[in-house]
Amino acid sequence: MRKVFITGTAGFIGFHLAKLLLSEGFRVHGFDGMTDYYDVSLKQRRHQMLMQTPGFSATEAMLEEAGKVSETIAEFAPDVIVHLAAQAGVRYSLENPRAYIDANLVGTFNIMEAAREARPAHLLMASTSSVYGASEDMPFAEALKVDHPLTLYAATKKANEAMAHSYAHLWHLPTTMFRFFTVYGPWGRPDLALFKFVDAILDGRAIDIYNHGEMYRDFTQVDDLVRAIRLLIDAAPALVDARQEAIEGDNLSPIAPYRVVNIGNGQKVRLLDFIDAIEEALGQKAIRNYMDMQKGDVPATWADTALLRALTGYAPRTDFREGVAEFVTWFRDYHRK
């Protein structure tokens, strides 16, 4: 039975990934600090559901606790490490920057140090589409230069990519970084747009729409996203072999078993169309408050998913209208009973 160590299992994406892997017979050990960035009861409920599943165990501790991180990983001896835990959110990084240094830099360093000792077959870590900054070269391909982050959050994730490459090179640790694009779905975070919009519309409150609605996002349904991660677990990078046929667009490092992979839906959706889908699912119109662009935000994101497809055969299954309707059903069941 393969063993996977996942950080952030009480979080949105980590919860869904753990569920998927457990359903396939993996043993999963979760590691989560249960921080109060948002409603802790939502995190606790996710973990309670996982704890009822055979094969799951968990440790509650902070990423910054180096000793606890290394001790837990050494004891579990995972075949694979998936590092998803982080201080998330572009906008919150403007208010509380130190949290991003502690969790995203120090915490990620602790994971990499523990991985260096534990020697898993594959280390996979979350980056973000925010590293592409204000680039207008769309769709965003992994080979694009990402040297101009617009927020500290994006900067810490860019730093994580550089740190991971150095460890992959120095210690021959097969490493994949994934850049996520606007993830949504059931059990989502309260600070994400879909959650906030549905909550406000049901309460009769106005929703803030930035850049006067001229926003586009590559909305990625969470089940599609964790399925992509599952496929990538079995696609560990190896050192370049001149005898192997190169994959077009591959950014595999020439000096390390390391690559970066976008995980997105592969299409950009106008925010106003997304809001229309929410209204349709709710059967209720939104009160729309159009606003200027917010500091640190970008008008559009759009993932080039050709590399992900070439490596794994992945294709998204969820149309955003279906995904929104599914979220609304969950929201009403969980929050509005």
Pin down the residues of each PLM region.
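Conserved sequence/active-site signature of Rossmann-fold short-chain dehydrogenase/reductase
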Residues: V131-Y132, V183-G185, M215, L225
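Short, conserved catalytic or interaction motifs in soluble domains
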Residues: D39, P186, N265
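Hydrophobic alpha-helix immediately C-terminal to the catalytic Tyr-X-X-X-Lys motif of short-chain
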Residues: A159, M163, Y167, F197, ...
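N-terminal Rossmann-like NAD(P)+-binding domain of SDR-like oxidoreductases, especially those catalyzing
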Residues: M1-V183, L232, T318, W330, ...
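C-terminal substrate-binding subdomain of Rossmann-fold SDR/epimerase-dehydratase oxidoreductases
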Residues: L20, A61, I201-K337
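Alpha-helical hydrophobic/aromatic positions enriched in membrane-embedded helices and signal peptides
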Residues: K3, E24, F31, A88, ...
